[in-house]
């Protein structure tokens, strides 16, 4: 049954284990990256909304100032 020395089988098991850990770490890193991207996207959307509100209120103020010519 043993065609190779025991240490060869141990190396093969080590390679398989390393590949498994590599895939698991890559998936975990992808989750962390996705969470970071979503957080940064939410911050960006909040900034855009605040800027839109600021411009809208600024535009309304300018319209009100233009109408009250005395």
UniProtKB/Swiss-Prot annotation:
Q: Where in the cell is it found?
A: Cell membrane
User: How does this protein lie in the membrane?
Assistant: Single-pass membrane protein
Q: Name one GO biological process term.
A: sporulation resulting in formation of a cellular spore
GO cellular component terms given for this protein: plasma membrane
In terms of Pfam families, this protein maps to:
Spore_YhaL
Query: Keyword annotations for this protein?
Result: Cell membrane, Membrane, Sporulation, Transmembrane, Transmembrane helix
Cystine pairings recorded for this chain: none
| Regions crossing the membrane | 3-23
Presence of keyword Transmembrane helix: yes
UniProt keyword annotation of Cell membrane present: yes
Report the induction information: Expression controlled by a sigma-E-regulated promoter which needs the sigma-E factor for the binding of the RNA polymerase and subsequent transcription.
Disordered as annotated region, ranges: 48-70
> Function, please?
Required for efficient sporulation.
Task: Name it.
Answer: Sporulation protein YhaL
């Amino acid at each position: 049954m043993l065609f190779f020395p025991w240490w060869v089988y141990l190396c093969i098991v080590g390679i398989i284990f390393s590949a498994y850990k590599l895939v698991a770490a890559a998936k975990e890193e992808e989750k962390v990256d996705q969470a970071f991207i979503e957080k940064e996207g939410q911050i960006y959307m909040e900034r855009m909304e605040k800027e839109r509100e600021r411009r809208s209120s600024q535009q309304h103020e300018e319209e009100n100032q233009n109408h009250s010519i005395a």
